[in-house]
From Swiss-Prot:
Name listed for the protein in its UniProt record: Queuine tRNA-ribosyltransferase
Residues bound to substrate: 96-100, 150, 193, 220
Positions that bind Zn(2+): 308, 310, 313, 339
Gene: tgt
Role: Catalyzes the base-exchange of a guanine (G) residue with the queuine precursor 7-aminomethyl-7-deazaguanine (PreQ1) at position 34 (anticodon wobble position) in tRNAs with GU(N) anticodons (tRNA-Asp, -Asn, -His and -Tyr). Catalysis occurs through a double-displacement mechanism. The nucleophile active site attacks the C1' of nucleotide 34 to detach the guanine base from the RNA, forming a covalent enzyme-RNA intermediate. The proton acceptor active site deprotonates the incoming PreQ1, allowing a nucleophilic attack on the C1' of the ribose to form the product.
Pfam families named in the record: TGT (PF01702)
Pathway assigned to this chain's UniProt record: tRNA modification; tRNA-queuosine biosynthesis
E.C. no: 2.4.2.29
Cofactor list: Zn(2+)
Family statement drawn from the similarity comment of this UniProt entry: Belongs to the queuine tRNA-ribosyltransferase family.
Any GO BP annotation: tRNA-guanine transglycosylation
Enzyme class: transferase
Amino acid sequence: MTDYPIKYRLIKTEKHTGARLGEIITPHGTFPTPMFMPVGTQATVKTQSPEELKAIGSGIILSNTYHLWLRPGDELIARSGGLHKFMNWDQPILTDSGGFQVYSLADSRNITEEGVTFKNHLNGSKMFLSPEKAISIQNNLGSDIMMSFDECPQFYQPYDYVKKSIERTSRWAERGLKAHRRPHDQGLFGIVQGAGFEDLRRQSAADLVAMDFPGYSIGGLAVGESHEEMNAVLDFTTPLLPENKPRYLMGVGAPDSLIDGVIRGVDMFDCVLPTRIARNGTCMTSEGRLVVKNAKFAEDFTPLDHDCDCYTCQNYSRAYIRHLLKADETFGIRLTSYHNLYFLVNLMKKVRQAIMDDNLLEFRQDFLERYGYNKSNRNF
């Protein structure tokens, strides 16, 4: 049996769904699942210190290979002692492959069998990223969990294009495995692609499962498709993945999508959503989204969320936070970011308890009704 640096332990499966309660063991510690992972694009979760992230309960954070490769450089980070030491974070870190950023940020990209040539979005210089280079960068960063280099086709691309794309992604995954210098202390995940085509998702999953990765990611979702389309893809994709390994849904952070992903057997999620919307004054609360910048909160001396026990809600009022944001004070963004991150990490804590209690569907319905989705009659 292969001795993986990343191990998944299943504790319980919810009676009425495919939801899994478990934990993932890494070289930098163990975290419970299902788990939402805050995104630290530039080796920092925007405005939050490592101590604050630990107080929130973030058992693992994500950093972006593409951005750190361009600035300050993966070799510099390696010389500093690796990403954990560089950013003073002693818990697990996951890095993406850089692929999504190449396709979404870079200009004039050209995809070939060898890799992707593109223009650096910072200075316009010509860059080349291959499966081997993506692995080399992540080996230098020293993350606990790494991603294979993949192509992330748009959800509505033609069938023939997506078929060629997933076949190339499978070949790239094999090349990445061979290039991996640190399989003893960094777990490399394969990424299942295939847009909305069930047979292509099956083909992609079969290819990657045969390569025996320590874990598997589901990519190519949350890229413009409907919530129902995402759920349909998860319905036929997660059962294709090994039960004894982690399952990671990339780029998903809306509360309803988190719960619906868990119902379909997903263990890990990440998204920039909580910090991105926080910078505009949008806060997630138990009763839905609240835009605290709005004038009606100018004299509202209550917390952002009456049911939240985070640092922000225990100490500051809507009126004060609105004042900070209107005055362009960074502390306001710190407070809203802290609250939103806490909200999603704590939501996953409640979801884990609901799995333990075998009442996840009831929890979902109650949450959606309170949050204001009015979607409690969705098909599961």
